[in-house]
Amino acid sequence: MQVVSVKKYKGSSYEVVFNDDRQIYLHIDIITDYGVRAGREFDEKTLDEIIYASNKRRAFQYALYLLDYRDYSYREMYTKLEKTYKNEDLCFEVMDKLVSIGCINDKRYAAMLAKRYVEIKKFGIYRAKNEMYQRGIRGETAENALEPYYDMIEENIALLLEKKYSRYLT
């Protein structure tokens, strides 16, 4: 396929039109990496590679956008990416990149959740573990994160009893 035109679209995105009236939207980095310009010929394999690279970049940017607001576990982020992009290989590549740069860290996320559930919300260990399980933190990671809070359970129970039943205890 031959590229007919490359026009600026929005921000750093460009619209690339091919001779069969097919159009795709690519980021400037993808255009420069693959040398996309008007008049250039691409075979189907190279075009698929360009589209895959573009989708991978979009997925990574989407993941960073989501991480701007709150932390995610590996499982949560993978599920969100898979719902949007429907490509397991692409999602695994993006997740590996996020883990390697330290954006996704299940141990850190589990420690933050444990503190939130036990200290702030006054949940018991079982409920905190169940909530962490729903968020994608499983097994030993959840156990290790909750370990420092086992001795706080009695304090939490006393506080809850005092708060809820103090009028009956007089």
Predicted regions and their residues:
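An alpha-helical, amphipathic repeat domain used for nucleic-acid recognition
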Residues: 1-170
